[in-house]
Regions:
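Glycine-rich, proline-tolerant flexible connector loops at the mouths of alpha/beta enzymes
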Residues: 38-64, 76, 100-113
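Conserved, mostly hydrophobic/aromatic
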Residues: 13, 33, 96
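N-terminal glycine-rich anion-binding loops that anchor highly charged ligand groups
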Residues: 2-7, 24-43, 47-56
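Active-site mouth loops of central-metabolism enzymes
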Residues: 5-27, 72-80, 107-117
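Non-cysteine beta-strand/loop elements that form the S-adenosyl-L-methionine
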Residues: 6-8, 93-104
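Acidic (Asp/Glu)-rich catalytic clusters
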Residues: 60-68, 85-95
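Generic structural signal for well-ordered alpha-helices
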Residues: 30, 54-61, 82-85, 119
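Structured alpha-helical segments in the cores of large, soluble enzyme domains
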Residues: 26-34, 88, 92, 118-120
């Protein structure tokens, strides 16, 4: 049996109440996960969250590219007319995890859009 590990500490872990990593901490965690533990996939952030998130993702992507790990670094993007994809590309990311609303109810009630508007 094959099991592939995806670590989400730098993205999902930071959503925990009271948890916030400084840029150097994020870079250190990425280094530890990819080089020390050999984790094959690391989700490092969410597109369009903040300028600080952009700088952290950019710095991690630069380091990962230098070390040959860029294909293992993933960034969460959204269905938003390509804005997330541009953000991730500008930060140096190469692997996008795309998040879309999973039901018509979420689209119409939370986003206040039609399904056609959501996927456009």
């Amino acid at each position: 049996m094959y099991v592939e590990i995806l670590d989400t500490t730098l993205r999902d872990g930071e959503q925990t109440s009271g948890v916030s990593f400084a840029m150097q901490e994020k870079l250190g965690i990425a280094h530890f996960l990819l080089e020390e533990l050999g984790i094959p996939r690391v989700e490092v952030g969410s597109a369009r969250v903040s300028d600080g998130e952009f700088e952290a993702v950019k710095r991690i992507c630069q380091w990962a590219d230098e070390k040959g790990h860029l294909g293992k670094v993933e960034v969460l993007g959204f269905i938003d007319g390509g804005e997330s994809l541009r953000w991730i590309k500008d930060a140096g990311g190469k692997v996008v995890k795309l998040l879309a609303k999973g039901s018509v109810r979420h689209v119409t009630e939370q986003l206040k859009k039609t399904p056609e508007q959501h996927i456009a």
